[in-house]
Design a protein with these regions (language model features):
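Terminal alpha-helical segments
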Residues: 1-94
Length: 94
């Protein structure tokens, strides 16, 4: 959830041409996502070693959140780029 929230905050800041804040939130999203990805990798490695692991709805839900957070982080970067181009085309400085 933290990565998703930071990505949304990055998009909101970009919309208002606050790109320093947008970049900061993007990097927070990236750090949070890296932490989650590390945990996911540890679980996958344990499964690959043959360690028994219960797959329940909570694990599926966690994987769904990780996937969505990853996608949203990339989308927030695209919004940042788009809003920077819009600002440049308008010739606005904020």
């Amino acid at each position: 959830g933290n990565s998703e929230s930071a990505s949304i905050m990055s998009i909101e800041a970009s919309r208002e041409y606050r790109f320093d804040e947008a970049h900061q939130q993007y990097h927070i999203a990236d750090e949070e996502l890296r932490t989650a990805h590390t945990i996911q990798t540890q679980l996958l490695q344990a499964a690959a070693r043959g360690e028994s692991m219960e797959m329940d709805i909570l694990m599926v839900h966690a994987q769904d959140h990780l996937t969505m957070a990853s996608l949203l982080k990339e989308v927030s970067k695209e919004f940042m780029n788009i809003y920077q181009e819009i600002q440049a085309l308008k010739g606005e400085k904020r």
